[in-house]
UniProtKB/Swiss-Prot annotation:
One of its GO terms (cellular component) is mitochondrial membrane. F-type ATPases have 2 components, CF(1) - the catalytic core - and CF(0) - the membrane proton channel. CF(1) has five subunits: alpha(3), beta(3), gamma(1), delta(1), epsilon(1). CF(0) has three main subunits: a, b and c. The record marks 68 as: Reversibly protonated during proton transport. Belongs to the ATPase C chain family. This protein is one of the chains of the nonenzymatic membrane component (F0) of mitochondrial ATPase. The gene is ATP9. Coiled coil: none annotated. The chain crosses the membrane at residues 19-39, 61-81. This is ATP synthase subunit 9, mitochondrial. It comes from Arabidopsis thaliana (Mouse-ear cress). GO terms for biological process: proton motive force-driven ATP synthesis. It is a multi-pass membrane protein.
Length: 85
């Protein structure tokens, strides 16, 4: 009887890539929560002091952009893990 040998390394590598990409996309959930917090704070702040709405909106957009940049970096890392490595 011959012993069958299986080369499971490509399948293991593909599985590790999928797990790594999934772990990298966890940051997207954190970014979504962060964006929600930014605009929630904007609404509360404008409700307290409507005269500062214009200035607060600028700060909120800056906070949104920085939070979204983190999400885009996480998405970029997930795509790099999936398609490059």
């Amino acid at each position: 009887m011959t012993k069958r040998e299986y080369n499971s390394q490509p399948e293991m590598l593909e599985g590790a890539k999928l797990i790594g990409a999934g772990a990298a996309t966890i940051a997207l959930a954190g970014a979504a929560i962060g964006i929600g917090n930014v605009f929630s704070s904007l609404i509360h702040s404008v409700a307290r002091n409507p005269s500062l709405a214009k200035q607060l909106f600028g700060y909120a957009i800056l906070g949104f952009a920085l939070t979204e940049a983190i999400a885009l970096f996480a998405l970029m890392m997930a795509f790099l893990i999936l398609f490059v490595f």
